[in-house]
């Protein structure tokens, strides 16, 4: 993957029905994220760009923080869609939001929501300012992420690695076989 800056996004925790940090699926998801991130780092990725979403992005942030603590050289950015992103979240999620704000680079695309076109422009900005993406998404299980996903598919020369449910099933099999 000839990529230096990687957009990282995917399903939210609610899309996957994961509402507890103790959910056994998290270990498998984070294991797959870790394996892929190490490969990306070995291939020269230096910046990981997040948008501040709970679920896949937050778990990715946790893995990136662990990798950094282990000595991997990497930079993390969060580019929120709006300045008030997450302000209505509960206390536990506010703590997660705070972690997104403690990375190497933090910006907001817009001061506040005004119209739906902002999301299209925001997605385009993310694609224009990264050289690839790591996406946990399956077109068979659509969410609002489909808009970004279709933009990624249309962007020529844009590197894409998609984490699929099939890959997670393989990760689960490997995990259970190693115990």
UniProtKB/Swiss-Prot annotation:
It holds the Pfam family YpsA. InterPro entries: YspA. Belongs to the UPF0398 family. This is UPF0398 protein SSU05_0416. It comes from Streptococcus suis (strain 05ZYH33).
């Amino acid at each position: 993957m000839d990529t230096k800056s990687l957009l990282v996004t995917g399903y939210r925790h609610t899309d996957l029905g994961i509402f507890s940090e103790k959910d056994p699926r998290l270990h498998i998801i984070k294991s797959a994220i870790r394996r892929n991130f190490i490969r990306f780092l070995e291939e020269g990725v230096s910046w990981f760009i997040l948008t501040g979403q709970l679920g896949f992005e937050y778990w990715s942030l946790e893995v990136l923080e662990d990798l950094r603590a282990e000595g991997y050289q990497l930079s993390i950015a969060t580019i929120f869609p709006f300045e008030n992103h997450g302000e209505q979240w509960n206390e536990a999620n506010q703590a997660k939001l705070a972690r997104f704000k403690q990375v190497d680079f933090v910006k907001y695309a817009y001061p506040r929501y005004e119209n739906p076109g902002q999301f299209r422009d925001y997605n385009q900005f993310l694609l224009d300012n990264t050289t690839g993406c790591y996406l946990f998404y399956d077109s068979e299980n659509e969410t609002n992420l489909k808009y970004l996903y279709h933009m990624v598919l249309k962007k020529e020369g844009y590197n894409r690695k998609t984490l699929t449910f099939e890959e997670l099933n393989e990760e689960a099999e490997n995990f259970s076989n190693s115990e």
